[in-house]
A protein has these predicted regions:
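Short, low-complexity N-terminal intrinsically disordered segments enriched in polar/charged residues
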Residues: 1-30, 115
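Short, flexible segments with low predicted structural confidence
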Residues: 19-20, 40-41, 67-68, 74
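A short gly/proline-enriched turn/hairpin at secondary-structure junctions
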Residues: 33-42
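A beta-strand edge to alpha-helix "cap/lid" segment located at domain peripheries
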Residues: 4, 13, 35, 49-116
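Low-complexity, compositionally biased segments
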Residues: 7, 20-23, 41, 96, ...
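Alpha-helix N-cap/helix-start motif
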Residues: 41-45, 88
């Protein structure tokens, strides 16, 4: 499977940075899974959009893709997240898409020590 992850990552992070919860959720498969850094798993667009709506109501960090690597239907993205307090926090997102190009699984990792 050949998939344009560069385009998908741009769309995903543009939606995140605009605080567009519905736009983010639309990128997921109906039964997509979001795995948070603490291991919590959210399944289905309804649960995922509610999570992003909650996050968007708060002061949202601003992630930027530093680099990514894709292979088939999977992609690993190294992120640098600008936090509301001005610090920068390394993170990584691991995506898997289905045959329709929708996110079927996203696992988020966050480094607990901000960069200086």
């Amino acid at each position: 499977m050949s998939f344009d992850f560069e385009k998908m990552l741009k769309t995903y992070f543009d939606c995140v940075n605009r605080q567009d919860a519905e736009g983010v959720a639309a990128l997921y498969a109906d039964d997509g899974v979001l795995i948070l850094p603490d291991g919590t798993q959210l399944q289905g667009r309804t649960a995922i959009v509610e999570f992003y709506r909650t996050v968007c109501k708060q002061s949202v960090p601003a992630p930027r893709v530093a680099s990514f690597f894709a292979n088939g239907n999977q992609c690993a993205a190294e992120l640098l997240v600008s936090m509301p307090d001005g610090s920068r926090q390394p993170a990584a997102d691991f995506f898997r898409v289905d045959a329709a190009g929708k996110i079927e699984r996203l696992r988020i990792y966050v480094c607990l020590k901000p960069e200086t």
